[in-house]
């Protein structure tokens, strides 16, 4: 399979993996106002508490959803009568699911940085992500076909979240 066939398989895997992010998006929306108020009140203990709890809770929720997806993926494919060549999406779903679990496991680190006085770091770390992701995806796709795109996503998002984690640890001792 080449070209648009790969795009269809990747899209199917991406939609399934994005299902893991639903609790994360809700948690970030709720936490934004609370974290903004805590920054205003200089309540660093509250920000740290939210960061720790969100990381643990989102990691557990995303692992649960990821596990449910993995356990039921073949049943889902048979119920939806997915074409045989789309079963290649299973490996993609595993890798992209890990990306979403890692992203969720870092909690609301992006929200904390974006609402702090260091909001510019969030912008620059996004540029770093882009600068890493594009060439890495190009190289990995040439080397490993479509699964290379998922590996590139895994590497770049892991590095991106590690950079933000380290920033919070060094600047705010969180």
Write out the residue ranges for each language-model feature.
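Transmembrane helix-bundle signature of multi-pass secondary active exporters and lipid flippases
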Residues: 10-29, 61-65, 96-103, 156, ...
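Membrane-water interface segments that mark the loop-to-transmembrane alpha-helix transition
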Residues: 45-66, 125
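Membrane-interface junctions at transmembrane-helix termini in multi-pass inner-membrane proteins
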Residues: 97-128, 139, 168-172
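Membrane-interface "helix-start" segments
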Residues: 54-58, 92-95, 124, 156-174
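Interfacial segments at transmembrane-helix termini and the short loops linking adjacent helices
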Residues: 5, 60, 69-101, 147
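Membrane-interface helix-loop junctions in multi-pass transport and translocation proteins
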Residues: 5, 120, 127-162, 166
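Helix-loop junctions and terminal segments of transmembrane helices
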Residues: 13-55, 109-115
């Amino acid at each position: 399979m080449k070209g648009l066939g790969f795009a269809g398989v990747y899209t199917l895997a991406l939609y399934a993996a994005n299902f893991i992010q639903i609790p994360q998006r809700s948690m970030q929306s709720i936490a934004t106002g609370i974290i903004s108020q805590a920054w205003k009140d200089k309540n660093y203990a509250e920000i740290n508490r939210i960061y720790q709890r969100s990381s643990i809770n989102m990691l557990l929720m995303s692992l649960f959803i990821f596990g449910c997806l993995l356990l039921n993926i073949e049943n889902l494919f048979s119920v939806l009568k997915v074409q045989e060549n789309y079963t290649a999406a299973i490996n993609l779903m595993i890798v992209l699911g890990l990306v979403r679990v890692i992203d969720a496991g870092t909690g609301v680190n992006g929200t904390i940085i974006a609402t702090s006085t260091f909001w510019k770091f969030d912008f620059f770390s996004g540029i770093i992500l882009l600068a890493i992701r594009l060439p890495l995806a190009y190289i990995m796709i040439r080397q490993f076909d479509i699964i290379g795109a998922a590996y590139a996503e895994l590497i770049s998002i892991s590095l991106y979240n590690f950079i933000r984690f380290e920033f919070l640890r060094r600047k705010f001792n969180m």
